[in-house]
Amino acid sequence: MKMKAMKTIQIWMLAAILVCGISFTSCDRADNPTGESTVTEFQHELDQALSWAQVYGPPTQTLAEEVAARHKGKTTPLNYKTRESTERKCITDNSRPFELKDLARTTVLCEYDSIRKVIDDVTATATERGIFGRYRHQTSDRGYWGDLFNLKFQYLYTEIQVKSYRNYYAANPEDICRPVLGDSLYNVIHTESGVEPGLSHFYYEIIRADTTSEATREYYKKLCIEYHSHFDPDYVD
């Protein structure tokens, strides 16, 4: 309890320092500067955004764990986007650090039949706490589907995904998904699906990286669709 209290104090001390010592922008970005900025200004804003992610990550994880517990589910460890990944994303999307919504992120995992209940619970809990930002059901022509929430804190959004156990297995290699799922559940999914974990993301990365060969993209797209057929179908008709 003492360690938990100390961690909470440290988080809010960081928040106080940021509020007092740094000039930052709102989550809505209405007051953000537009146009060109210097590298120094961008790096300063990047520092701020990454620091706020450290503040808002723990309450995001707490909400996810509370919801998971109510539905006999699990959560992944809280994950923070790295500085390098954040900078690359800003360049690729022509965006600013505070516009990114996944600098702190986690995932609620549950049985396929519980997904709708978990989604309703995350929505209700986040709304009750005044931090509901948005919800999206995501699909793709590669067979992938999933559900994503963004929690809206004062200065930054964070992310909670909702996945079935089997679709989490499909998206992550063994060294990531086995510790989260546990040996027993991992082995059940491995036996029932008859395929190795993590190929969904593996195929996606190949498709995304190859921008020249339509034939290559189509080949891996078909592999991805076939791979997803071994797991839970999209619950949205």
For the regions a language model picked out, list residue spans one by one.
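Repetitive helical segments and hydrophobic/amphipathic motifs
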Residues: 16-19
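Long beta-strand-rich cores associated with HINT superfamily self-processing modules
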Residues: 90-237
